[in-house]
Amino acid sequence: VIKEWESISSIHEFDIPFVRRYFIDKNMVPLTLHQATGEFVSQKSRAAVFRADSIEQVGSDTLYNPRVLAFDIETYSPFDLTIDAEKNPIIMLSFYGENFKKVFVWKRFKTAIGYIEFVDSESDLIEKFRETIDNYKPDILTGYFSDGFDLPYIKTRADKYKIKLDIGLDFSELRVKSARETTVAINGITHLDIFKFIKKIIGTTMETYSYDLNAVASELLDEKKHDVSLAELTDVWDNRHENLEKFCEYNLHDSLLTFNLAVKMLPTIIEMVKIVGIPI
């Protein structure tokens, strides 16, 4: 309609992202059943590679149960200093998914908790980040403020040890993009910062004025974070590592809350994706 106006000489669609324009042109709705014709090709990839000659939507069935993996990190942060990814290591890493839970930590202590796994160093912990994602094969990797904190922090620490975070399905590295706001992308795996979605999309309908994990989980899940003092973590790490177990439980519980929030929000996210026509 607009291009028929006398005052409009041309429309270039520069403001429409390429992916969005492709879906519009092909009449494709993300997360619904499609049929493709073409051939499989030999290419280094964690998933089969198919060169499609044509793609068409053949049904309205929706992928409602994607494989979700949540993660969270704890860092060494002296209480009187600002967070510094260049200097301060990651000391714990947790994952939570369906029938899967794990905490990696690189100081040893006595524990009977089966999901705690000890590694020898921070670099080994970062390798476990890469290996766990590769082995679990999530459709969606989710974190809470993971665009703004967790993934950029992990990338900075990985760069320090010259570790390639080649977790993309095409073996490409995780990409941290800083423009108006920091975003992280992984080829072939959807990265969902559930904090961003909740704050931007449903935040105005919530009662809380704070969007920290505890407040949001309390309102949406009727669950809360574990009650531990993170101010003590640095001292415990340095001097009393026999007391680290409760912080590992805390770390895993944050991943559990993040997982539950993502699963709860997924039906809303999926319907929005179908309406707007842009992948998650």
State what each model feature region is.
Residues 1-200, 204-280:
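The two-metal-ion catalytic cores of nucleic-acid processing enzymes
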